[in-house]
Amino acid sequence: MKPEILKLIRSKLDLTQKQASEIIEVSDKTWQQWESGKTEMHPAYYSFLQEKLKDKINFEELSAQKTLQKKIFDKYNQNQITKNAEELAEITHIEERKDAYSSDFKFIDLFSGIGGIRQSFEVNGGKCVFSSEIDPFAKFTYYTNFGVVPFGDITKVEATTIPQHDILCAGFPCQPFSHIGKREGFEHPTQGTMFHEIVRIIETKKTPVLFLENVPGLINHDDGNTLKVIIETLEDMGYKVHHTVLDASHFGIPQKRKRFYLVAFLNQNIHFEFPKPPMISKDIGEVLESDVTGYSISEHLQKSYLFKKDDGKPSLIDKNTTGAVKTLVSTYHKIQRLTGTFVKDGETGIRLLTTNECKAIMGFPKDFVIPVSRTQMYRQMGNSVVVPVVTKIAEQISLALKTVNQQSPQENFELELV
């Protein structure tokens, strides 16, 4: 049996490799070897699997659908990517850049995480020509979905080696800056921060457009000094800066998630407006799955931790729950009383959100693959952008660039085509 079929079965039922292996009473290591192609699943085991899952999966349709599924990149596994990240980054980026000429614009993806920003800009006609991410598990998810292994520590990447691009995208960490200011003889106040790495690149590449994402706390971070330094730095470099805060729940996502967004253009004549939230609401109950197994919270943990009388209580939801849930955080798997949202379902009556439910409240497509452990999945989803919001911003950026080119063909904003 081909590995792709086994992956498809797990994806449809939202099972881990261990859960899938338990269905036919083999070790998770055996299942892992089947999926990786190291060994082949015996037909008898596949027949046993069909018998066990006949009420949940139409295997004839499954075989027919296989060719219609999104491509899953699996030439390299997690271990190979962890050990040989930079070498594989070089190899996969060379392949990626071959068809960059056919795109509307080219962009780079810094602090890329699992690729939420990339997903958003690609659907608007962009082509990614460089990506960077330090976390090995996020790299694996990124590779599985896009076929590219991101480069590692951006501080070790020479700016001159980064390809020319039209848009720099970055969901950078929020860090305080020096209060010394730009006095002669002193370092720039951004020195030693990840924003400084962005500055270093755009100084070298003269990047025409920037898209930056951060937590809304950036606005008041360090008594407003952080945002002040960012804007002053970009304006001193000739950029026209726009920024705002948008809430995902206003874009048809059942999650209250506010984020800070900044868009900047070197061309001062470009007119840009952030997307007006369509104010489309979606109830969390609409995306919840039924009869879920494997995500339950033990009764002991419920009694001894979740519902202690002297402490706060978690938010419990079900299919009848309206409105949006609290912000999904990267530490969701730690089952936090005050910030956690849990579902009234499962073997013990209360469970965690499933992989598919997390994808839904972050706006990822259903076929986006999460090849890592559940703990890593929660971390990755909690650290990601909400795809539909960024997609709308990317659409506005693309529209602004096209409009200025049409209006001023002689003195237009030339996109790099190298």
From Swiss-Prot:
It catalyses: a 2'-deoxycytidine in DNA + S-adenosyl-L-methionine = a 5-methyl-2'-deoxycytidine in DNA + S-adenosyl-L-homocysteine + H(+). Keywords: DNA-binding, Methyltransferase, Restriction system, S-adenosyl-L-methionine, Transferase. Disulfide bonds: none annotated. One of its GO terms (molecular function) is DNA (cytosine-5-)-methyltransferase activity. InterPro entries: C5-MTase (IPR050750), C5_DNA_meth_AS (IPR018117), C5_MeTfrase (IPR001525), C5_meth_CS (IPR031303), Cro/C1-type_HTH (IPR001387), Lambda_DNA-bd_dom_sf (IPR010982), SAM-dependent_MTases_sf (IPR029063). It is an enzyme of class 2 (transferase). GO terms for biological process: DNA restriction-modification system; methylation. This is Type II methyltransferase M.MspI. It comes from Moraxella sp. The gene is mspIM.
